[in-house]
Amino acid sequence: MIKQLSIVCPNTGGLPIAYGVCEALRAHQVYWAEQDTDSSPMRFRQFVDPTPGERVLLVDDILRSGRRLRELQELVKSKGAEIVGLAVAVFQPNPSVLNFAPLPVFYLAKMEASYYKDASSCDLCTKGVPVVKIWN
């Protein structure tokens, strides 16, 4: 058991992954950060947050830009906890992915994706292949 380690995640897709990681590592606790709206800042529930000096692993379901994990990182730092790394189920970096060095980033799968500035630079678009939106 890693009693000195706790897991911190956003309350969206990262929560099921966080509980699995907590169980696998036999970590102490899972904390999750919430947002009232997409534009509001992340926060912990009252009296349920990491303590100063507590070692935590940030966990989420997918890492693309890193924006949500960066916001979570800043929230955890503001509480005085020590971040030991990041863990995600899927690492699918986009061209503007944030750098979390020197923290290690652990992932189960890495997906390469093609990103284009506009339709004229996309081979499939120029061939007339229709665009299908799969998430918002």
Regions found by a protein language model. Give the residues of each.
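Short glycine-rich phosphate-binding loop at a beta-alpha junction
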Residues: M1-N11
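PRPP-dependent phosphoribosyltransferase catalytic core
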Residues: Q73-N136
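Short, hydrophobic beta-strand segments that form beta-sheet elements in well-ordered domains
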Residues: I7, V30-A33, V84-F91
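A structural micro-motif
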Residues: L5, A27-Q29, E54, A81, ...
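A contiguous pocket-lining binding segment that forms or flanks enzyme active sites
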Residues: Q46-F91
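Short, glycine/charge-rich flexible loops or terminal/linker lids adjacent to PRPP-binding catalytic cores
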Residues: L15-L57, R64-R67
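Short beta->alpha connector loops
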Residues: T12-G14, F91-Q92
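Residue-level preference for short coil/turn positions at secondary-structure junctions
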Residues: K3, T51-G53, A101, D118
